Every structure is written in C-alpha cells, then in structure tokens.
Amino acid sequence: MASATLPAWIKMPSFLKKILKLRGRRQEDESRSRMLSDSSTQSYQVNQLTSEETEAGSTIPSTPSKGQALPTEPKVRAREKSRHRRPKIIDQVRRVESLGEQASQRQKHMLETLINKIYTGPLGEELVQTLYLRIWAMEETPESLKILQMREDIRDQVLKMKTERWLRTLIRGEKTKLKDFQKRYEEVHPYLMKEKVEQIIMEEAWSLAAHIVQE
C-alpha cells in the first residue's frame, strides 16, 4: 500500500482524506479501550487484595465499641487529683476551734468575765485602739485595708469579735496550760504567717488571757 504521506505539491483526493480520518479515529478508540481495560484490571486487583487483607484482620484498625473503655480525659484526671489535695490552712484553724470548749469551771468563769469586759468596759476600748494602731502601722494587705476603711463602730465590733474567737480557741480544754497554748499556736502558725491581721489579734488575745492560763 502506498504511504499515507504525500508530497505537498500533490493534492490529496477527498475520499483518501476520509479514509485516513476514519483510520485515525479507529486507532484512538482502540487505544482508549486498552487504557480503560488496563485501569479496570488494576482496580479489580486492588479491591481483591484489600478484601483478602480485611478478611485476615491485618490492615483495618478496630474502633472502640460502646462497652470499651476510652482513655481518661485530662479534665477527669484534674478533677480526681483535686479530690486528694491537702486541706487548706483555714480548715486547720476550724479544726483547732472545734476541739471543745473550756471545761475547767474556774478558767471558764475567768474567760467569760474577760470577754464580757471586752464588750462592755474600758478594756474593750483600749483593746480596739491598740489593734487599730498595730494594723495601721503594719504592711498593707487586703485584709488590713478592709478593716481600716470600715466605719469606726463597725470596725470596733469586728475587732472585738475576732479577739473573742481567738480567746475561745486558745483557752479551752479540761485545764489549759502553757504547753497546750504552744501546741495550738503551732497548729495555726502557717495560717497566721499568711494572715498578719489575724496574727496581731491573736497576740493581743493571748496577752489578755495569759493570766488565766497561769492560774
């Protein structure tokens, strides 16, 4: 058969152009069919391999079922950790206060007499003036600032109540002795180191009650 390529000066008949065009289309169709056939074969092989590996249980990771335990969340860990924290210092102070009231009749009478003088007599006025000056002279803290900004009558009442609290904390038990006071002071010492106002009030309370312990 003659070559399909002719010199440029020879004009190609129209019927030959149609034959060449049809042959080109046929070759393109055959090439496209082979490509589709090869692609289908490869896809089938991949699907078959995946199916075999799935049956063997070796490739697809399993997801946790409803009954299966999930990893502990960080928030849950933090919540569980907070349950085991050490008790706060203020809790230690409350524990000291809850150990019992004064049981010795003589000391109890002296204690109640002292507290009554604080609320009704000149001893109370002298006490609140001393506390006010000591709190005013100390390094400023939120608690000291709060007390200094109170109205005078309210401040005096608050200071007397705080003093009574410390008196009842320090002077109690079957018969309070100096060693008992020392033990109670050691228990609340960390709290007093953070609360300087309370430390000042406790010191003044002890100064007023020392004669009761020494009886």
Swiss-Prot record:
Residues 15-22 are annotated as: Involved in self-degradation and in host STAT1 degradation. GO terms for cellular component: host cell cytoplasm. Protein Y1 is produced not only by alternative initiation, but also by proteolytic cleavage of C'. Only alternative initiation is detected in vitro, whereas in vivo cleavage seems to be predominant. It is found in: Host cytoplasm. Residues 12-34 are annotated as: Disordered. Keywords: Host cytoplasm, Host-virus interaction, Inhibition of host innate immune response by virus, Inhibition of host interferon signaling pathway by virus, Inhibition of host STAT1 by virus, Inhibition of host STAT2 by virus, Interferon antiviral system evasion, Viral immunoevasion. Residues 36-66 have a biased composition (Polar residues). Pfam families: Paramyxo_C (PF01692). Residues 25-35 have a biased composition (Basic and acidic residues). GO terms for biological process: symbiont-mediated suppression of host innate immune response; symbiont-mediated suppression of host JAK-STAT cascade via inhibition of STAT1 activity; symbiont-mediated suppression of host JAK-STAT cascade via inhibition of STAT2 activity; symbiont-mediated suppression of host type I interferon-mediated signaling pathway. The different products prevent the establishment of cellular antiviral state by blocking the interferon-alpha/beta (IFN-alpha/beta) and IFN-gamma signaling pathways. They inhibit IFN-alpha/beta induced tyrosine phosphorylation of STAT1 and STAT2. Blocking the IFN-alpha/beta pathway requires binding to STAT1 in the cytoplasm. They inhibit IFN-gamma induced serine phosphorylation of STAT1. Block the IFN-gamma pathway by binding to and stabilizing the parallel form of the STAT1 dimer, further inducing high-molecular-weight complex formation and inhibition of transcription by IFN-gamma. The disordered region at the N-terminus is involved in C protein self-degradation in trans. This self-degradation of C protein may play a role in the regulation of viral RNA synthesis. The disordered region at the N-terminus is also involved in the host STAT1 degradation in order to counteract the host innate antiviral response. Belongs to the respirovirus protein C family. The C protein is found in virion at a ratio of approximately 40 molecules per virion, presumably associated with the nucleocapsid. The P/V/C gene has two overlapping open reading frames. One encodes the P/V/W proteins and the other the C/Y proteins. The different isoforms interact (via C-terminus) with unphosphorylated and phosphorylated human STAT1 (via N-terminus), favoring the formation of parallel STAT1 homodimers. The different isoforms do not interact with host STAT2. C protein interacts with L protein; this interaction has an inhibitory effect on viral transcription and replication. This is Protein C'. It comes from Sendai virus (strain Hamamatsu) (SeV).
